[in-house]
C-alpha cells in the first residue's frame, strides 16, 4: 500500500468504511462536496470493498484517473494491504474518521459522536481534538440477535415496521406505574425498568418496540453518562441505527429529560466514510 499523494487538493478522494455488516463509500470533490453516498451489504471485506468501489465509480461516471486518493477505514480495513485498482490507498483511523465526518455533517465543533453500528463507540470532539472515550457492546447487532431469537427475523426494517404498531407501556415499567406523582426530575412517562412489564403473551409488535427502545435508550443513557463533567450537551448520532424511525421519539424524550441535544445529520450512516475521505484532506491518517 502506497503512501498518500502529497498534493491533497486535486481530484476526487474516495472514502470507504468497511464495516461488519455493510460497506459504505463516498466521494468528496475538490470543493468539499459529498458525492452520492452508497452502501452494500458486506459479505467478506475484500469482495465488498471492490464491489462497492467498482459500482460507485460506474454509477457516478467517475474514471480511475479522476481519483486522487482512496481512504479506507472500519474493522474490515485491516484486510486491505494493497492499492485498490492501482490507486494510492491509505488507512484512516476509524475514531478520527467518526469525528471528522460528524463535524462536517453537523457543523458542530464540540460534541460527542455516537457511532451506532453493530456495537456503539463514543468519540469526544473539541475542535481538532478528537478522542475515543469508550463505548458499549449494545448496538445494531444486539437488536438483530435478540430479534432473531424473539421474533424469528433479523431484518431490522421488518422489526421497525412491526414496532410502529407496538405499545411500549405493555413492555417497559414506567414511573407512572409505580408512583402516583412524577418524581424529582422524572416525569410519569419516563422508563423505570426496561421489559419489566412484559407478559408471556406479549405481541410481536410490542416485543419489537420493546427491543428497539431498549437498545436506543441504553445507547442514549451511556452517551449522557459519558458527557458528565465535560460540559458537552450536543450528541451527534451516526451509523446504521440512526435510520430507525423510532430514534426521533426516543431521543426527543431524552432531550427534554436531560436538557441535551441529539443530532442526526443528513448523511448520518455515511459519516465514517466521509470522515475517512476528509482525513486525507486534513492529512490526519495512518498509512499502514
Q: Where are the regions that the model predicts?
A:
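Glycine-rich phosphate-binding loop plus the immediately following alpha-helix
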Residues: 128-183
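Conserved phosphate-binding catalytic cores of ATP/NTP-utilizing and phosphoryl-transfer enzymes
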Residues: 1-8, 80-114, 119-129, 274-282
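Adenine-nucleotide phosphate-binding core of ATP-dependent small-molecule kinases
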Residues: 184-234
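Short beta-strand-loop/turn "lid" adjacent to the catalytic site in phosphate-handling enzymes
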Residues: 38-42, 53, 58-94, 127-132
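Glycine-rich phosphate-binding loops at beta-strand->alpha-helix junctions
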Residues: 72-78, 225-254, 269
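Glycine-rich phosphate-binding/hydrolytic loop that grips phosphoryl groups
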Residues: 100-105, 143-147, 260-288
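Short glycine-rich, Thr/Ser-proximal phosphate-binding strand/loop in the N-terminal lobe
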Residues: 4, 8-51, 130
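Short glycine-aspartate micro-motif
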Residues: 13-17, 67-71, 111-115, 135
Amino acid at each position: 500500500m502506497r503512501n498518500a499523494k502529497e498534493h491533497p487538493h486535486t481530484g476526487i478522494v474516495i472514502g470507504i468504511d468497511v464495516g461488519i455488516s455493510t460497506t459504505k463509500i463516498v466521494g468528496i470533490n475538490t470543493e468539499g462536496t459529498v458525492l452520492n453516498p452508497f452502501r452494500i451489504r458486506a459479505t467478506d471485506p475484500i469482495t465488498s470493498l471492490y464491489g462497492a468501489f467498482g459500482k460507485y465509480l460506474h454509477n457516478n461516471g467517475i474514471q480511475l484517473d479522476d481519483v486522487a486518493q482512496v481512504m479506507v477505514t472500519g474493522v474490515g480495513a485491516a484486510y486491505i494491504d494493497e492499492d485498490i485498482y492501482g490507486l494510492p490507498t491509505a488507512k484512516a483511523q476509524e475514531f478520527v474518521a467518526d469525528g471528522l465526518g460528524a463535524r462536517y455533517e453537523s457543523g458542530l465543533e464540540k460534541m460527542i459522536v455516537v457511532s451506532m453500528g453493530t456495537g456503539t463507540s463514543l468519540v469526544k470532539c473539541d475542535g481538532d481534538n478528537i478522542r475515543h472515550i469508550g463505548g458499549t457492546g449494545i448496538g445494531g447487532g444486539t437488536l438483530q440477535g435478540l430479534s432473531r431469537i424473539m421474533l424469528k427475523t433479523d431484518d431490522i426494517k421488518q422489526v421497525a415496521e412491526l414496532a410502529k404498531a407496538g405499545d411500549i407501556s405493555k413492555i417497559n415499567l414506567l414511573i407512572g406505574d409505580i408512583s402516583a406523582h412524577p418524581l424529582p426530575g422524572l416525569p410519569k412517562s419516563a422508563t423505570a425498568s426496561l421489559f419489566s412489564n412484559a407478559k408471556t403473551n406479549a405481541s410481536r409488535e410490542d416485543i419489537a418496540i420493546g427491543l428497539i427502545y431498549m437498545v436506543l435508550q441504553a445507547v442514549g443513557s451511556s452517551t449522557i453518562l459519558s458527557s458528565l463533567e465535560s460540559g458537552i450537551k450536543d450528541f451527534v448520532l451516526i451509523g446504521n441505527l440512526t435510520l430507525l424511525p423510532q430514534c426521533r421519539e426516543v431521543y426527543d424524550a431524552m432531550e427534554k429529560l436531560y436538557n441535551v441535544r441529539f443530532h442526526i445529520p443528513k448523511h448520518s450512516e455515511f459519516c465514517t466514510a466521509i470522515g475517512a475521505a476528509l482525513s486525507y484532506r486534513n492529512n490526519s491518517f495512518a498509512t499502514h
